[in-house]
């Protein structure tokens, strides 16, 4: 299962989520939203708001499940770890 994460490059919780995925061998893709600009940034922020109206980070998509923030237990449950 591939995990999609919306993150900020300066966010400590986002860094923890990325580290967790790497340490557990979870295939994941992330987008550091703060490093985008212009229309691309607006488009990605609109996408984040679909899953997380508060637009907070990290926003993590595991299949159909949305996890807001770095919640290791919720991530483990969603991934079956």
Task: List each language-model region with its residue ranges.
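Local sequence-structure signature of Cys/Sec-based thiol-disulfide redox active-site neighborhoods
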Residues: 1-31
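Short alpha-helical
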Residues: 12, 39, 74
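Short polybasic/polar patches that bind polyanions
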Residues: 22, 49, 77
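Thioredoxin-like thiol-disulfide oxidoreductase module
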Residues: 33-54, 81
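A short, hydrophobic beta-strand/beta-hairpin element that forms part of a small beta-sheet core
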Residues: 58-67
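Thiol-/selenol-based redox modules, centered on thioredoxin-like
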Residues: 74-81
